[in-house]
Each structure stands twice: as C-alpha cells, then as structure tokens.
C-alpha cells in the first residue's frame, strides 16, 4: 500500500505520517519546505519524541519526500492508494490543483483501483471542503469518473504537538503528546476499508467532531481565559489551580450532558474521556501558553464555536450551564497586545457595554437570562 501525505510539518511528521509509516505503508511526504524535503530524502527517517507519563523516542523510517508544487507529486497521486493532508485549513485550496491534475492523469492511465483522500485538519468536514476545491480545478469531463473512483473521506483529528522542547536544530525532530485520535467517516470510502492502527472508523463522525469541540476545545479555552485572569502563564499552571479546575471540569460536564442527550454517549465513558482531557492539560511537557490558547476570542465566542455552541445545547435541552457561563464571562475579559481580536473585543465592550457586545458576538438575545448571567459574572471579575 502506498500513501502520499501533504504537509511535512510537525503534525504531518508527528501524527498522521507516523501512523501511516508505522502501519507499514510506503509513505512519501509532499511539502514546499526544501530544507525538510532534503533532510527526509537524505535520511529517509526521523525521530519523534512522545511525551507523557513515560517519555519515549520513536524512529519513523522508510519515508521519502517530493515538492508539493512539482510534477512528481502529480505522478504520485496517479499511483498511490491513500492521500492525506495536514497543511492547515487555508492551504487546502492551494494543493487542490495538483490533486486535480493527478486524478486526471489517473483516469487517463485507465487506473480503476480506488483512491481515498483524507484531509486531517483542525476543522469540520475538511475533506468535503477540499473536494470542492479539487472539483473547481477539474475539467468537466473528468468529474463523473472522479466521483465514481475517488473517496473523499472526512475525519476528526486530535493530538497536541507543542514546540520542540529539546535543544536541537534537527529540522525533522518533533515532539508529540502520548494521546492521539484520528476518526474517519467510514461511509465515504471507495473500495475496501483500510486497516491502519490508530485510525478509528465511524458512521457517525459529527458526534466525535462535537465531542472534541465540546470537551477538549471548550475546556482548553476556559482554562486559558480563567488562567489569564488569575495570572497563570501556562495551561498546566492554570488547571492545577483548584478553583479553575472545578469550573473547567464543571463546564465539560455541562457540555457533556448535551452530548449524552444528543448522541446517546455512554455517561461513564464520557466521564472517563473528560478525565483524560484534564490529564492532557496537566502534561508538564506541553508548555502551552494561556495567551496562545486564548487568542481569537471573537471567533471562540461565536455561535458555532467552543463556548456558545455547547451553551445553546444546554438551553435546547433545559440543562445546567453555570460553569459554561463563567467561562464565557472570562473570555470577555481576555486582553492581549499581540491579538487583534482581543483588542477588537475590548473596544466593542467599551463602546457598547458587555450586554450588547456579547449579544452581537455570540448571536444570543441581549434580553435573555443567560446574557444577564454572563454580564453579572463579567462585572464580578472587574
């Protein structure tokens, strides 16, 4: 089995590329960073530091690399069995023309073997977006063939890849946390389902997308906002503060009650998942700065994101939301000289007051009880 992976950055090498290579798949990375490409082709291997309770160093070997903007990558798309990406949501559009060319070449060669493409990005239904970009670049006469032979498989990914802690100038060395989760929509594959250790197949991907958003992302953000208010530097420092931990765990339990109601998750398994997430926040090797995690508060306070979306679920089902509201109030206090959204948030609150500002950002009704509750919490923190 052969795979092509777009994006030889830390996530690509430390997470998806590692799982593919560990599964014995013949792996080629595609990237624009010539230093990384040269190092991969000189060594055909690299080291991954897996950090957690037990630190270990794994060697990933038997890998190759090509430029993602040359002819070689087009030829590879025409012959591999799997294409994966970890390039960042914005770059998906940039790699689509090369994928379209490779698929057209595959058709011209008469290759009937199915190919599955999986975007492994921190976004909802990233592969479906990539498919749209690819189809925009395809000739009209190739579209029906691609629809019949190429699987565009959505996935949800979760692994924290912090800046490398080791004092090394090796462009290939990467540090990752022990935890990893790669869940793919099995209903979208063409041909036989692959067996790749570390890849989980599901027919209900949105349940897992929301589980991550409502637990990891909600908890991470609230830890950052309360941590910043309390003067903590890192996520670990913040989550070890008992007062903060109680609110964060409470918020994740409130959002969890929504998931249990909506998707019939097992309550005990979900409680264990929450504890696992709290353990990840405590990882001493992940030097996660509260300011980095808290940035872009306008996006994080928007209706479809990690704070308001679970809150809307509690309102829909008539469930408690006391701790989620505390987290929202803390987010309204987020200030950072390096973050334009934090400055815009401060200006909006100064101009309109917290009630109207929160309603405008979140889409919540300014006259609602829940906005009044958040404003009370916001004022109490002044």
Curated annotation (Swiss-Prot):
Domain of life where this protein originates: Bacteria
GO cellular component: cytosol
Reaction it catalyzes: D-mannitol 1-phosphate + NAD(+) = beta-D-fructose 6-phosphate + NADH + H(+)
The protein's Enzyme Commission number: 1.1.1.17
Keywords attached to this entry: NAD, Oxidoreductase
UniProt KW Coiled coil keyword: no
InterPro entries (UniProt xref): 6-PGluconate_DH-like_C_sf, 6PGD_dom2, Mannitol_1_phos_5_DH, Mannitol_DH, Mannitol_DH_C, Mannitol_DH_CS, Mannitol_DH_N, NAD(P)-bd_dom_sf
GO MF annotations in UniProt: mannitol-1-phosphate 5-dehydrogenase activity
Any one GO BP annotation for this protein: mannitol catabolic process
PROSITE patterns attached to this UniProt entry: MANNITOL_DHGENASE
SUPFAM superfamilies (alphabetical): 6-phosphogluconate dehydrogenase C-terminal domain-like (SSF48179), NAD(P)-binding Rossmann-fold domains (SSF51735)
EC class (word): oxidoreductase
Residues where NAD(+) binds: 3-14
HAMAP family assigned to the protein according to its UniProt record, in alphabetical order: Mannitol_dehydrog (MF_00196)
Similarity comment: Belongs to the mannitol dehydrogenase family.
Matching NCBIfam families: PRK02318.1-2, PRK02318.1-3, PRK02318.1-4, PRK02318.2-2, PRK02318.2-5
Alphabetical list of PANTHER family matching this protein: ALTRONATE OXIDOREDUCTASE-RELATED, MANNITOL-1-PHOSPHATE 5-DEHYDROGENASE
The name this protein goes by in its record: Mannitol-1-phosphate 5-dehydrogenase
């Amino acid at each position: 089995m052969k795979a092509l992976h777009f994006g030889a950055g830390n996530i690509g090498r430390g997470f998806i590329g590692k799982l593919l290579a560990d599964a014995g798949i013949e792996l080629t990375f595609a990237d624009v960073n010539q230093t990384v490409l040269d190092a991969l082709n000189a060594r055909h291997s690299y080291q991954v530091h897996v950090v957690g309770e037990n630190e270990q160093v794994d060697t990933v070997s038997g890998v190759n690399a090509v430029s993602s903007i040359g002819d070689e990558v087009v030829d590879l798309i025409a012959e591999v069995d799997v294409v994966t990406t970890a390039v960042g949501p914005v770059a998906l559009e940039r790699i689509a023309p090369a994928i379209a060319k490779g698929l057209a070449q595959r058709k011209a060669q008469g290759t009937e073997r199915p190919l599955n493409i999986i975007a492994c990005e921190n976004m909802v239904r990233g592969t479906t977006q990539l498919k749209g970009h690819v189809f925009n670049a395809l000739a009209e006469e190739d579209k029906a063939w691609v629809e019949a032979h190429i699987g565009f498989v959505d996935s949800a990914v979760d692994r924290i890849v912090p800046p490398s802690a080791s004092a090394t100038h090796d462009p290939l060395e990467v540090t990752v946390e022990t935890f990893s989760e790669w869940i793919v929509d099995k209903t979208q594959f063409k041909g036989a389902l692959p067996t790749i250790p570390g890849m989980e197949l599901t027919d209900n991907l949105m349940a897992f997308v929301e589980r991550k958003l409502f637990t990891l992302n909600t908890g991470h953000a609230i830890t950052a906002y309360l941590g910043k208010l309390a003067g903590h530097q890192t996520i670990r420092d913040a989550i070890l503060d008992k007062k903060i931990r109680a609110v964060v765990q409470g918020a994740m339990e409130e959002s969890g009650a929504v998931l249990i109601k909506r998707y019939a998750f097992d309550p005990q398994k979900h409680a264990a998942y929450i504890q696992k997430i709290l353990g990840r926040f405590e990882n001493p090797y992940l030097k996660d700065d509260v300011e980095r995690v808290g940035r872009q508060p306008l996006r994080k306070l928007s209706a479809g994101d990690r704070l308001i979306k679970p809150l809307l679920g509690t309102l829909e089902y008539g469930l408690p939301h006391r701790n989620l509201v505390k987290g929202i109030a803390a987010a309204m206090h987020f200030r950072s000289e390096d973050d334009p959204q934090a400055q815009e948030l401060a200006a909006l609150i100064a101009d309109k007051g917290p009630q109207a500002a929160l309603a405008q950002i979140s889409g919540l009704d300014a006259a609602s009880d829940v906005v009044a509750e958040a404003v009370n919490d916001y004022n109490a923190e002044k």
